[in-house]
């Protein structure tokens, strides 16, 4: 078990914001992007607390990480109030050589008006106040299996396993960019020894 808490004081906080306005063409409202750097003259305090608790019962593991945080100025430094990561898996040795870890993990955070991504700059900026899109409140669940034998590691993951289970259109972690649909991912890492 690990518990931590803290207060961070940020002075002269620099951020990007979109000061562009929307315009109408052929009955369609289109946004303009005018991203500018700004500096907040005052100070912003961030209060946070974190709890990490891991359970183990034989080969069954359950790892949890919960973070609570609040910003004194949510318009300039928006943060989700609660972040949750949980990982439930079996970890065991097969035939005294092959390490196997199989389970599922979930990431979820409370809704908030997250910074949006600007492809032109490759950076995140605050959303335009004329149209705020909140993200969060949606669990992202992945099922996976990891295998390791000596210097070889292999994994297979079913990413966004709950995509077809929940009829929810709020599957965004970044405004305007939906999460990828369910997919299977593979990976291989092979360490060669000299």
Feature names for model-found ranges:
Residues 1-194:
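Exposed, low-structure sequence patches enriched in small/polar residues
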């Amino acid at each position: 078990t690990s518990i931590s808490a803290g207060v961070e004081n940020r002075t002269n906080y620099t951020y990007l914001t979109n000061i562009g306005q929307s315009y109408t063409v052929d009955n369609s409202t289109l946004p303009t992007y005018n991203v500018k750097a700004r500096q907040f003259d005052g100070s912003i305090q961030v209060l946070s607390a974190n709890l990490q608790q891991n359970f183990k019962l034989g080969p069954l593991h359950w790892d949890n990480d919960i973070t609570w945080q609040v910003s004194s100025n949510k318009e300039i430094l928006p943060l989700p109030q609660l972040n949750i990561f949980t990982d439930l898996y079996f970890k065991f040795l097969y035939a005294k050589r092959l390490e196997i870890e199989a389970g599922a993990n979930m990431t979820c955070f409370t809704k908030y008006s997250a910074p949006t991504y600007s492809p032109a700059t490759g950076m995140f900026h605050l959303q335009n106040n004329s149209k705020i899109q909140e993200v969060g409140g949606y669990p992202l669940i992945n099922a996976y299996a990891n295998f390791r034998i000596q210097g070889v590691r292999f994994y297979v993951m079913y990413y966004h396993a709950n995509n077809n289970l929940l009829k929810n259109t709020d599957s965004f972690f970044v405004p305007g960019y939906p999460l990828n649909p369910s997919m299977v991912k593979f990976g291989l890492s092979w360490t060669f020894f000299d």
